[in-house]
Amino acid sequence: MEVTQMTSPIHNYSEIGKLKTVLLKRPGREIENFTPDMMPRLLFDDIPYLPIAQKEHDYFADTLRDNGVEVLYLEKLSAEALDAGGEEVRNHFLEQMLTESGYAAGSIHDALKEYLGSMNNQDMVVKIMEGVRKNELDFVPKDLVSCAENQDYEFYMDPMPNLYFTRDPSACIGDGLSINHMTFVARQRESLFNETIIKYHPRFANKGIHVWRDRNHTTRIEGGDELVLNNHVMAIGVSQRTSADAIQDIAKNLFKDGQYDTVIAIKIPHNHAMMHLDTVFTMINYDQFTVHPGILGKGGQIDTWTITPGKNEGELNLQHDTDLKKVLKTALNLDDLDLIPTGNGDPIIAGREQWNDGSNTLAIAPGVVVTYNRNYVSNELLRKHGLKVLEVISSELSRGRGGPRCMSCPIVREDLKK
């Protein structure tokens, strides 16, 4: 079947359809505007060297463009959305950002609002992203908390170094998206940018876009756990960053609309190295997947639950299984499939290359993937399995613990030919 006409600004019905439009965030000062002491707080393991990280990210973006992909940037769309929304939207955005930064009211709130409010929208967005240090404001707080408890902390508003992982704050599913309540405080403000873009940017506003789950929840879900396997099946990781109750929420909403009828929940280890499903498992062709051997138990077992609509609206049926290959073959109606092990299954190589995002491949067409060049064992294995591998440079970007899939939020893909 030929590609269907795309009338919605969001059209993403698979992990592997030819990528047409993607959302990126070019690394800015936020990735170096912190100290080693702040790394645990900001969920980072290292501090990238910004000039090289930017060159690497530009190479990544150019690789996508060279393959026919339209590249949009979060920082630009955010400012354009505020421009389009006018003063009321700008004020609401700033108030919400200050509230979520810990300043719903008070003298610090007022000082920050005056400082940020004096900027144009583009400069304000960039400054919020890179963080606001105390020495930037001509202001001395008088409250006891600031004077007695937080006097040695350098920031009023923390930087957001994880923003270049645009996969996580939102996930485009079908003709809609989830705008995610993220797990850790360090990242929870990020999805406010996505919400603002969807509501007010002329490209997306008032276009009938489904919001499958908004950010105003207490249960956690992140886009790295959300895999759109085809036009009616999703896989979602039960992980450090995504909870089972959030998966049930989004499944009910998808089923109610009728676009999707199956969600496969896959339980992975709850740790930093394997924070999302896409750090250990990705779809790269109709019948091919990467998988990190470290998530599989004896005999290749892993807990999965296939969720389908129940008899009554809002009810869910669950089918537990530990044979991932069988579950995928059944859900995707495949006779067989190819699970390609990270690092060729070698325990040392697999562990090293998974840490450097060897499992985090981005498919830009069926059988065509973008990977980090540093994971040479996994890359060569992919080629031996018939895939076209486009390597991108990665010495600094990889320090953030995310690969090509993490750094990209597909907005439009061509439909798969049936």
UniProtKB/Swiss-Prot annotation:
The reaction(s) this protein catalyses: L-arginine + H2O = L-citrulline + NH4(+)
Record carries keyword Transferase: no
Top-level taxonomic group: Bacteria
Residues at the active site: C406
GO molecular function terms listed in the Swiss-Prot or TrEMBL record: arginine deiminase activity
InterPro entries hit by this protein: Arg_deiminase
Subcellular location: Cytoplasm
UniProtKB keywords: Arginine metabolism, Cytoplasm, Hydrolase
Name the UniProt record assigns to this protein: Arginine deiminase
Organism: Lentilactobacillus hilgardii
Gene: arcA
